[in-house]
Curated annotation (Swiss-Prot):
Pfam families for this protein: Glyco_hydro_15
Family of the protein in this entry: Belongs to the glycosyl hydrolase 15 family.
NCBIfam families: oligosac_amyl
Positions of the catalytic residues: 403 (proton acceptor), 406 (proton donor)
Transmembrane segments: none
Gene Ontology biological-process entries: carbohydrate metabolic process
Protein name: Uncharacterized glycosyl hydrolase MJ1610
InterPro entries to which the protein is assigned, alphabetical: 6-hairpin_glycosidase_sf, 6hp_glycosidase-like_sf, GH15-like, Glucoamylase_active_site, Oligosac_amylase
GO molecular function: hydrolase activity, hydrolyzing O-glycosyl compounds
Enzyme Commission number(s): 3.2.1.-
Keyword Ubl conjugation: no
PANTHER family referenced in this protein's UniProt entry, alphabetically: GLUCAN 1,4-ALPHA-GLUCOSIDASE, TREHALASE
Keywords for this protein: Glycosidase, Hydrolase
Length: 615
């Protein structure tokens, strides 16, 4: 079995599909907010019940190439049950296309059940589940309503309470639904069933529709909407297919022809981009990951900046622009941003991580350099100026803050690199709006950092750079690479930086390989990360290019190192999805998957022409 799971969505509705093909939860009406725990299940009843999580299914999962349709195949000795999940670009509905194939040389008769134990909203309250004469189930509270229907006639139903005798779950275990039409409570559940009859070696298919809306007390609005979607399902699907085809076509313009010759890299590149698009909300926020454990369904300026850059590099310009508009609206009066936000713009964690401020300015400058759009700089100049002025004060005072890993407080190498890059990018953009003369202090601060940071962070005895000063932390940490890549405060071929990178490489001895954050890491047990492995790979590739330009005979070894690390990352792509971490012993995904930053770093590597992102 391939333990993977996936996501499907548009810019308002995002669904997480679990390892067994179950719907774990939905985000609606925005990507990442609110959370609706679905707890769905499929079951087959043929004299006894067989749930989709039972051991004797052979389960595989994958995306259909060049689409955001996620396919789960459950196979046993009698049937092949295939579920194709997708959310169309035009409608906020999850469509589950169910295919059932009879493998035997005889006719099959059994029941198929769809079960839900949906908890609506961030703070679930009493809700009601009801079977309507229209042939669908509705579940609602005072704010939202969900409608579950099918284009195949429903043969039976049950509305009950999960931990009571009326539970639809218990009914499925018995194979007969009681057909109670309504139930209210905190933990209502429901089920619908179909009597399946399939001739030998034949197949049948039908759709299950899950439609969420805001609720004003009128059932007819959502039931009419469901009918429209059901009657036009093929057109809705074709519209989405054409949209995805257009996206891939645009991406192809920015992928080097040689890259397209490597089918695996090309396939992962397309999937990584399409995955990032599903993390982008219609209001401009970009969530770090569609994950609840750990809870990453929020907007971090850092993660959003890396994702914006990745999208920009491959020609997707409107989403980064929308992200910058979102960040501009929520910027603090002093020019800073808080640690993270809900996608509706409300603050969640209120600490300051200065590196995020620098990252946002860096991403804005990359966008400007790729587009040459001076009006973009004019539109956001107030945002840029406030952020740069904040960074200048931080830089001159070496002001401490929380590190990018959100674990420690101090003055960090990565943070100072991001501060330098943010100031340099703001200074660069000032020329586009004829403001260079008014921001000369930024230029002086850039030179100050260029001189002071290497001097203050260098450890003479260890012959490498420190993780932080004030307090001094000599820990070998992969984020120190940020001083050079991507932020360019220290030259990539500076001998001190090379020795720092080599110390990082030697510090990790995981059974499965890869590079972690720092050797003493205990988060999820301390594992190799996708972003840190790519980070060192990117640094080595950049070093190779610089040394090659200088005809240095030692350049090739760094290209070999870079490729080895990149190949490790390729090995741990799960049908194009990258997690945050890989288990150091088992080689399975750990923590959030997909993680936006992991996918973005892969795309930055694949783009190859890193000059455009170096400040």
């Amino acid at each position: 079995m391939i333990y993977m799971g996936g996501i499907v969505g548009n810019n308002s509705l995002l669904a997480k599909i679990g390892d067994y093909g179950e719907i774990e939860y939905l985000f609606y009406p925005q990507v990442g907010y609110e959370t609706h725990f679905f707890d769905s299940a499929l079951a087959v009843y043929d004299k006894k019940v067989k749930w989709h999580w039972d051991d004797d299914w052979d389960i595989t999962q994958k995306y259909i190439e060049e689409t955001n349709i996620f396919k789960t195949i459950l196979e046993d000795d009698k049937i092949i049950l295939t579920i194709k999940d997708f959310v169309p670009v035009s409608h906020n509905v999850l469509i589950r296309r169910v295919y059932i194939k009879n493998k035997l040389d005889k006719k099959l008769n059994f029941k198929l059940f769809f079960y839900e134990n949906l908890r609506i909203g961030e703070n679930p309250i009493t809700n009601t589940v009801k079977f309507l004469e229209d042939g669908c189930i509705v579940k609602y509270n005072g704010k939202y309503i969900f409608c579950i229907g099918s284009d195949k006639r429903i043969d039976s139903f049950q509305c009950g309470n999960r931990y009571s005798k009326t539970s639809a779950y218990i009914d499925i275990e018995n194979g007969i639904l009681k057909e109670h039409k309504e139930s209210s409570g905190l933990l209502t559940d429901s089920a619908i069933s179909w009597n399946i009859k399939i001739d030998e070696k034949r197949s049948l298919a039908f759709n299950i529709y899950i439609l969420p809306q805001r609720f004003d007390g009128d059932f007819s609005i959502i039931t009419e909407q469901l009918k429209i979607i059901m009657n036009n399902s093929e057109n809705i699907k074709n519209l989405s297919m054409n949209y995805w085809k257009h996206i891939i076509g645009e991406i192809n313009r920015f992928i080097h022809p040689e890259l397209r010759q490597n089918n695996k890299i090309y396939s992962i590149t397309k999937r990584a981009l399409m995955t990032l698009l599903m993390l982008c909300d219609k209001e401009g926020g970009i969530i770090a990951a569609p994950s609840l454990h750990p809870d990453y369904r929020y907007v971090w300026g850092r993660d959003g900046s890396y994702i914006s850059i990745a999208l920009d590099l491959f020609g997707i310009r409107n989403i980064p622009d929308r992200f910058f508009e979102f960040m501009s609206k929520i910027q603090n009066a002093d020019g800073s941003w808080l640690q993270n936000y809900y996608v509706n713009g409300k603050p969640r964690l209120t600490a300051i991580q200065t590196d995020q401020i620098g990252s946002i300015l860096w991403a804005m400058d990359v966008h400007y350099r790729l587009t040459g759009d001076r009006k973009f700089v004019e539109r956001y100049w107030n945002t840029i100026e406030k952020a740069a002025n904040y960074l200048r004060l931080v830089a001159l005072n070496f002001t401490p803050c929380f590190d990018l890993w959100e674990e420690r407080f101090g003055v960090f190498a990565y943070t100072m690199g991001a501060t330098y890059a943010g100031l340099k990018c703001a200074y660069s953009m000032s020329k586009a709006v004829n403001k260079r003369d008014k921001v000369k202090d930024w230029g002086k601060t850039i030179e100050f950092l260029k001189h002071e940071v290497p001097k203050r962070f260098y450890l003479e005895d260890e012959e490498r750079f420190a993780k932080s000063i004030n307090p001094l932390d000599k820990t070998i940490d992969t984020s120190i690479l940020g001083l050079s890549y991507p932020f360019n405060l220290i030259d990539v071929d500076d001998e001190r930086m090379i020795k720092t990178a080599e110390a990082i490489e030697k510090a990790f001895k995981y059974k499965v390989g890869g590079i972690g954050r720092y050797p003493e890491d205990i988060y999820f047990g301390g594992n190799p990360w996708i972003i840190t492995t790519l980070w060192l790979s990117l640094y080595y590739r950049r070093l190779y290019k610089v040394l090659k330009e200088k005809d240095d005979n030692g350049a090739d070894i760094y290209l070999q190192k870079s490729k080895k690390l990149f190949n490790w990352v390729m090995k741990y792509s799960f049908d194009g999805l990258f997690p945050e971490q890989i288990h150091k012993e088992l080689g399975v995904p750990m923590s959030a998957m997909p993680l936006g930053w992991s996918n973005a770093m892969f795309l930055i590597y694949v783009y190859e022409n890193d000059k455009v992102i170096i400040p």
